[in-house]
Amino acid sequence: MILTNTEDVAGHKIIKNLGLVKGNTIRAKHIGKDILAGLRSIVGGEIEEYTQMLDEARNEAIRRMEAEAKEKGANAIICVRFSTSAVMQNASEVMAYGTAVIVE
C-alpha cells in the first residue's frame, strides 16, 4: 500500500478514486505512568511516555486506515492526514484519514 500526503503518487497514474478511508484509536496511559509523566512535566522536557503512546496510536490508526482501503480494493492512499483530540481526561484519539485510490 502506497501512502502519501500529496494529491498524486509520483511515477503513477490515478485510475480510480475510491473515496475517504480512515482509521482511529483511543489511548490512555496507565495511572502510574501518568503520575510519572505529570512529575516530568513540572521540570520540563519531553514526556517520553506520551510520545511513545501517540506514536503507537498513529501506527495503529494507519494500520486500520490501510485495512479499510484494502477492503475497497485500493493500492494507494493519497492526501493522508492525522487528527488528534482529547476525548476525556488522560485519553487521546488519533485518526488517520485520506483518499483511497487505485494507481497504475
Swiss-Prot record:
Source organism, top-level taxon: Bacteria
Stored InterPro entries: UPF0145_dom_sf, UPF0145_YbjQ-like
Pfam families associated with the record: YbjQ_1
Family from the record: Belongs to the UPF0145 family.
Protein name per Swiss-Prot or TrEMBL: UPF0145 protein DET1617
Organism: Dehalococcoides mccartyi (strain ATCC BAA-2266 / KCTC 15142 / 195)
